[in-house]
Amino acid sequence: MRMTAMLAGAVLLTAGSSAHADYSLLVKSNCLACHQIDKRKYGPKLNEIAARYADDRNALETLAAKIKAGGSGVWGEDIMPPQPQVSDADARALARYVLSLKEAR
């Protein structure tokens, strides 16, 4: 029983620190200059992006590619400028974090 409680605690700490690390990556990568989680700034809300791609089984790869290469036309006239300075691994981590923010439908 004690071992189970310790393992559960370790899992919770790991999950929490992972989410914190990914949010920190949003800050470090300057994503929050245009996006916020639940409010529209210049670009779409991050949880709105997550909701749009919720049923797309290629969403992780699609969003990671858009982070790196940029894109336009998906959100009206909004343009996502390319972010070539973001590593492939960080682009995937950012995409994974954004997809975790899906709004309740």
Predicted region positions:
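The canonical Cys-X-X-Cys-His
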Residues: 29-37, 94
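Bacterial N-terminal signal peptides that target proteins for export
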Residues: 1-7
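N-terminal signal peptide c-region/cleavage motif recognized by signal peptidases
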Residues: 15-18
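Short, solvent-exposed mixed-charge patches
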Residues: 104-105
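Hydrophobic helical h-region of N-terminal Sec-dependent signal peptides
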Residues: 8-13
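Flanking scaffold residues of small Cys/His-coordinated metal-binding clusters
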Residues: 26
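Axial heme c-ligation environment in periplasmic c-type cytochrome domains
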Residues: 42-53, 66-93
